[in-house]
């Protein structure tokens, strides 16, 4: 047996080795490659189908196999692979070959296809070589048709798995060859069938013409198929010839920009000099400086324009010739390159990202994934987020300076060196850290121990430092962009220069190194240049060369000035290869004289696209702007596709100097006059008419507005359009004024236009023209008018409505309702009359709702039909011209031919009928009819003015006061009887059939019939005739009554006689029947049986069988049978009666005996069985009859019961939810009573009133008790043993639990330590019993856990905890103009969101309160769809498993180091009870977030924004803190009491807090940003999220008390001035500045302060009183806001221009934080749109009174929309709800700047550090990072400032931030021991540490982790590589596939918990830190 098993095992092993061998795998993949069929197979099949001869078949097969062999070889041979794989090279080769191939084929058919067979194999035949070449080349093209190219790529992918690549390629080729032979064999069998059929046909054999024709047709079919396939594939390739030539930004534009910058710079310098003159009085020196600056700028501009470099000893002409030759060569080379392929064009279908602050778009190079090697942990690793520009730079350096590079050391040596270096650094930092702790333990002062950072001090005595923004010794987020300053430099007195000064010469070497072909040649030229300049250069190139220069010649000075903006670079690091590459040359500092020279700004040039693109719709506006700027420029190049839209001119102003505002004012005045003149006729007499007109605006304008364009649809678009119109008219007005001055009375036209968009779906918009459409994101469209694009991957998930769909629930409802309606009339005796009436009313209401719904659907359907018709006309070529011509023709025919002819015919007919003619009335009405020309959307123009380009854009003709022919006219005296409420639409539109329709493209309406009034008149006449004959009819009726009475008596007598005869006949009939029924045997015993018959046959039922009259003498057989049947029937009825009687006495049983079967005989035993059978048949018939009779009532009752049960279920469901909601609300309110006993009871015992939503896990209590019994032992879970496959498997199986206790994990996006102990135990047991965690390895040491302590910190904090100021610094890019929707979580983390009464309650509240608050997250109104909920649950499941997979550690006695399911039973939550002081960044981002979507704070939708300075805001007066606006705690700081209740008046609190003068005794403190210096009390966590209605809880708690805007004078200073001072306008200031006054809104209290704009002069005075804290550099930026971007405003070319930088920065600030808009309801929008249409017509009329009155009467123009009262103040507009002031909700976008800033911590020293204010927090500048609000949200409880040991909360903060980060990083790496846990003894194993001072410091208290003042927090933040990769695999929501092909990382959730410090690290000597820039 053993031998057999061993042999079997060997055979199995041998088989496995054979299968896994290179040869077998190659054969397998090669065989799969056969099924990738390309167009080359068509050529091969053509030779076989056409039977052209064996030579061609052999040549085609040989070429095909050879081409495939070359393709296989190319996978191994790189040069061949590059030649065949590069698309551009292949395209260049393919296009000429295809053209020649098809041209040669079509022109040489006869010579090419020679069907005569050749007898010799070696006779030269061109067709054979041609076939060979075709098959060979087409096989190399390597494009595939079926199924795809994936099977072919498998060979390339699998080849890298094996070392023996040649063997793999060879075997794969043979595998393909085998598959190819089999495939050809099968195809040959199929193709042989048609040839056999043709050979069997005698006609084909005899007729050679048919054979040749068939061959030609087959050849053409193959060629056409091949041509189509090739064209399709060419569309997928970048064509180098047919490309969109984009316009390059010209040098003249750049020159103009530099001139503008220079002019702005000179103006700024002159303004600064004026200020200095006023202060210092140094007039002469400053004037000379300004003149000198202007001269220098002119010289710089001259040098920039010429761009000539000429040195000493060389003439200018020589350099000119050389430069021209170089430019010619470069131009030729560039033209050749761009002719074939422009590498700077948009090849991929990317969106054009445009920034308003710059001219061209920024190239977002970091968004795409890029692979490059970099040093990590001392080893070369592949980084997939490496910057492409940096890799290109290193490649250039390597090529140019390869001789200077150091020798490459082995990887092991590099790793050893890195390990040793990092160990030394770690030890040094550790020793320094321990020494500082020991110094603290010995009693040293904190200031002497804390590591300090140098600051640049402005005043040494007062210790005033420069602002962080300008401090050169600081780096990080406080370092902004500095503008060009002026520094005093050294000048040589002996220099006799006309310009009076010299500059320091900086000669850059790196520029020539990178862009020269030979470095040695550059060295020689450089030395020669230095010699010409008289400079002694250093020979080493490593050290700086600072050599004296005696005197500069004038040529040398010019040469120095000609060098443009060289920058100084320095490469830092351990390798000194590129260190100090630049040799600097300085002037001689012997003779010193002060002069003002500009400092070159060191910038990083942002990579931008070369082209500046414009969209099609922006062309008009930009064209006008360019005409203003430069008449020579023209931007005919539209590089961006925009939505299909047409510009429609609606008004043209030809008058000189008029504008749209004056015109509209005249219209409004005209309307005022109209209203005044028509008050008596309209307002008084037709009040109801006007009210109904206004009420029915929606009905009359629904269909009109739907055909309008998108801009007229929405109010925002209307506002935007109006803004553009005002801009256009303003620009034209300025042009007109200029032309009037210059050219006299030269009139120009001002056009007012709208843009009409197409309703058809267009997914090409915003794409760049010329980009490769095949590589764009794939979309699926299945409808003609589709609103959204869908990916093919998710197409199956879309709910597509089938063709035949039935609403089952609706049908059931109708059926049940019908049953109930049938039943309701029968329930007349019911006592519930009231309920029946209610039910009837309810049914009627439902019926009305259904009718309304049907009407809405019908209107929507008609609207869609109109849109489809309009789009069809718009898309068909020349359709608009044809339609417009037809409409104009019909209009002319109707107006001047048809209607006058009808009038003439009518009046002639009246005269023939002897009626008076109505010529005047008819022609008067005919003259009132107006045919107004309208745009395609219905915007009215005039009768004579046609729309611009109406033949191409379309036209509508609107008929006002349409004429209808009437047989006669009523007199005007009877008009008052007319019902005024019946409004008649006195307008219509003309159709192409000459008919009238109410809406464009609508259905024709019914016209009044001409003879209808005549018909009505005849009916009235008939009625009159009937009335006259009424009396005659009454007389006749009275006379007829007597006759009728006599007739009735006679009829009654006849009826009585007939009845008597009928009775007699019945008696005779019954006598014969009874006699025949009796039995003949009865005659024998008459006495006895007579008695029995009387008893048994009392009731003789009629027989159902018809009895025919019979002959008494002759009895036939049929008559006998009839008699027998009658006898049996009577017997059956007797038996039924007897059974009924017996049943009453006793129940019927199957053993019934002795029943009389016959009426004549008694008990007959021979008939006993028969009697039983008859009895059961009778009973069976009886039951069926009973069922049949009661079936109807049974079904009704059954259906009633079902219907009632359904209703009961529905009501129960509602009751459950309502009860659940009430219980949750009750618990929420009870949560603030601070009763620990109730909380404990609620925690440990389930609530019986709450209905559980999932089944309870079996024996949950036993598991809980078992675990709780062993509560002292820590619980761990090893998640590192999970494999990737197991993770995905569990992702599929993991279901989101709905149990109310576990909802806080899945639905409440919060941290794990707030989960109750019972929940943790439950999940721990649940997951262990389900086998998710490996219980065997839970106590083992974890691999790689030594460097992953940071993960425990991550899981213990909420990941969006960022300050508002922090987020405001991120500044997302301006080009994101769309709403960026993110699912955000309601804020529960604000420092002021909760309070505590006592410190001891902090732990309990943190452990228990969150189980009741926000457990079940109800989706908002935007998220109610099941698919949305499903997606949210999926994301929660991903996040939950991701956290479980990331966060694991084996650390004792620390909740943050424990398992995510571990229960901390002793309440030792060290990381959460530690009080953290609030810093400048402590306000969380979550205060502005909600369960809704956030919008981009940088979007600019052309809305009007609020001015910053009108807000009267002082955050120091924040006395009362409202923690919630609906239900929450109300805190009074004076009394320190907490109230619980509902603050209803806070629900609609103002968005801007008006200053309240409340007299309080507050001590002075520094500037309180957002209320950070306010006193924090012990308060509970205010987490007021109802379970079902979260949208009713506003999340503007902090904003209502402290808005996110502050006065400008408080942003940059610590303000010590008057706290209650308001910002106002001084009436005594200069009046030349523009000021805007805003009236006071009506707010709470009787305040009389107004929201006014502060004056800039007052602002400057207030700043002067505060003290001059900064130098002149600071004074130049007085009014810059806190979020100043620092970018140059003049770069915003063709954009919104500001008068000053202050306005630009203010505009940027307002766009970030505020959005101010007009909110109009939908009916208001429609009414406004209708009014606009009427206004367009009234503008063109000389006397618009009649049209205006008729428009008002018909409801086409509404008075309530006109806002005639133009004196509305701001409070009234706010009160009406028209004007809204709202904060823009901050989005959670991040960019590269934020990632860099989050890695840097700033340490500041300030004198206020030593101050202590009682009752307030201390202001600290040691490190603002750790004073964050993430812990304060759990209860920042410091009230008393006596305790000064807050500096020791984190001992590592003794070090500087840079050393602190370095210490953390170095301590987390396990250099050699990767498999074991080797923790840092200082941090993790305090018992073994050698530092006694640290031991004493840590072990002062047993409850160290729970002590607020002594808590130690270890904060690690490094992302390891493997965890990021796992995260990418597990949660695809965090990643994105960009542009359809590449994989780029986006939306990485940043775990930002401690202020500026985040999850990334910037450490120069380590490259493990990841820098990621989110692309979206």
Curated annotation (Swiss-Prot):
GO terms for biological process: protein transport. Residues 619-642, 830-861, 1633-1669 are annotated as: Disordered. It is found in: Plastid, Chloroplast inner membrane. GO terms for cellular component: chloroplast inner membrane. The chain crosses the membrane at residues 11-31, 64-84, 87-107, 126-146, 173-193, 221-241, 1054-1074, 1202-1222. It comes from the Eukaryota. InterPro entries: TIC214 (IPR008896). The keyword Chloroplast applies. Keywords: Chloroplast, Membrane, Plastid, Plastid inner membrane, Protein transport, Transmembrane, Transmembrane helix, Transport. It is a multi-pass membrane protein. Its main location: plastid. It holds the Pfam family Ycf1. Residues 836-861, 1633-1665 have a biased composition (Basic and acidic residues). Belongs to the TIC214 family. Part of the Tic complex. Involved in protein precursor import into chloroplasts. May be part of an intermediate translocation complex acting as a protein-conducting channel at the inner envelope. This is Protein TIC 214. It comes from Nymphaea alba (White water-lily). The lineage of its organism: Eukaryota, Viridiplantae, Streptophyta, Embryophyta, Tracheophyta.
